């Protein structure tokens, strides 16, 4: 089913309330057709992001390659009751309003529910899971052990992610919920240095309908890097938006696709995107069928007077005017 033509919305998800202490306010955000939480609250009426909420099983890095085990360390060892209880406490504490009707973002990035996708600094989750099975079945061969580890991990990873989402939807019924970063694409990456998503990842996304069926919004991340060429930056955005729209089109309820976009380069966070990069990445999101953009910012972008002044200047001269042009052109 094709997704109906929708209104294109841009949201402000930047902790600019931190600039108020310097007497700097960001009231102009709304003048640029950008949806902005009232009083510049970070968790507010239009959008609220919850970082690592509840008590998801995790291996929290300590010094010297050691880690602290939280709630069992891996999903198959975790206590879901404790997690869901803490999750609700977290929600009620950060954003008590049960009538919240904005976008609710669950930002959980410690592991991924597809076993294979836990590489890089997430590889510890694979190793930990494999060790558990090996201790239990010392005489199994490597292949059998890995298969069993993968099966157990994925079963409970799904349980944790699915139940968390269902609980969020149950307690904040009017909100539109989704997990930050999903669906993953793994394009413009060392092993897949092209705009198109990794083929295996696309197949895995198709198998993750249990997650996407429960989300009202899909929230791919399109942060770009300075090390890429301007064309490669566009390719990165294109592939990720396309994949999210593809997933949405395959679902009965066609969830909206809002791309998470950061105004600095991911590998050079003191440099704002050039005007051309802003225009082209925004256009790419529109062209490929996205429903909107969530402008994100880190607390370390706004933790000094000079940083706040720079961001304000950038909003007024570059980002704001482009946001107006894009929203007016589409709508």
From Swiss-Prot:
Glycosylation sites: 79
EC number: 3.2.1.35
Disulfide bonding pattern of the chain: 19-308, 185-197
One GO cellular component, as annotated: extracellular region
GO biological process assignments: carbohydrate metabolic process; defense response; hyaluronan catabolic process
Tissue expression summary: Expressed by the venom gland.
Transmembrane segments: none
Name of the molecule in the record: Hyaluronidase B
Reaction(s) catalysed by this chain's protein: Random hydrolysis of (1->4)-linkages between N-acetyl-beta-D-glucosamine and D-glucuronate residues in hyaluronate
Keyword Transit peptide on entry: no
Family: Belongs to the glycosyl hydrolase 56 family.
Molecular function GO labels: hyalurononglucosaminidase activity
PANTHER family in UniProt: HYALURONIDASE
Enzyme class: hydrolase
